[in-house]
Amino acid sequence: MFSRKKSWTRDAIERRVRELGWWYQHFELPTGVVTGNGQSPAYLPETRWRLIEPYVPASLAGKTVLDTGGNAGYFSVQMMKRGAKRCVLVEPFVEFSEQARFVAEVYGFQIEVINEDVHTFCLTTTERFDYVVFLGLFYHLKYPGIVLDRLAEMTRERMYFHSHVISEEVADHPTRADYMPGQDDRLLADPSFPKMLFLEQLYNGDPTNWWIPTSSALEPLVRSSGMKVVARPHPQLIVAEPDQPLGKVVFDRKLVFPKYGKRGGAVHPGPQRVDPELWRKLLAMRDESEKK
């Protein structure tokens, strides 16, 4: 859906991009202004879009989209360009939410930007969406399985799921219908067995990295959330659709965290801000990158 589009000059866009600080998503805006040159730790979301684009309908007319951890809104914009009726972008950090609102305004799209923790959104919303974008967020979550389960329940047609992984080789692993303590420990310890690695300390200098799955864990995680894998265009990326749950079952229902939480309801951390010292470092990296 289009909003009333403000006329932005190239100079005005360049100035506002600069004012909004460091950008994680580097892409081109109208008039040709780019938000950055793609130097790490930022990235070019267009490379990921090329992988999922073949699995996105050419027309999303009448469809709704949820973009979780949407950052500056690149993927929301791509969905709106295809005619999505409604797009909701959930982003916990104030800085990136402001960038997303600016990007939506520059493009003239009505993107609903919700500045909220994704755990909170998933545990409290009763909405469902036709398409769910869950890219580059899973490993930043303290409770990723809860969020994946809820997003699977919220998906009507298709989910795009990406996670950083340890070892991109998708290897076969020994399986059992039921693993026995002791005698099957060697199978569970096999490097190819699906695993989630917990990070107590920093990973890549980022305090928001908590869990990293192995490549072999992505598909079992998706299946156990009640979805089927329809494509895997990259070791880190899965396209999934709703299915009957294939994982563990409790009381004839999928094992999933209740959406309204326990013991008085979910905790709402509210909007968050990037650590000031980290933000200064990122800005310094941006400035140094621009000199090259």
What are the language-model segments listed below?
Residues M1-V34:
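N-terminal, positively charged/glycine-rich alpha-helical extensions of SAM-dependent methyltransferases
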Residues A42-A61:
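Conserved alpha-helix/loop element of class I SAM-dependent methyltransferases that forms part
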Residues K63-N71:
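Conserved class I S-adenosyl-L-methionine
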Residues G108-V118:
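Conserved SAM-binding strand-loop segment of SAM-dependent methyltransferases
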Residues F129, V133-F134, K142-G270, R280:
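S-adenosyl-L-methionine-dependent methyltransferase catalytic module, highlighting the catalytic core
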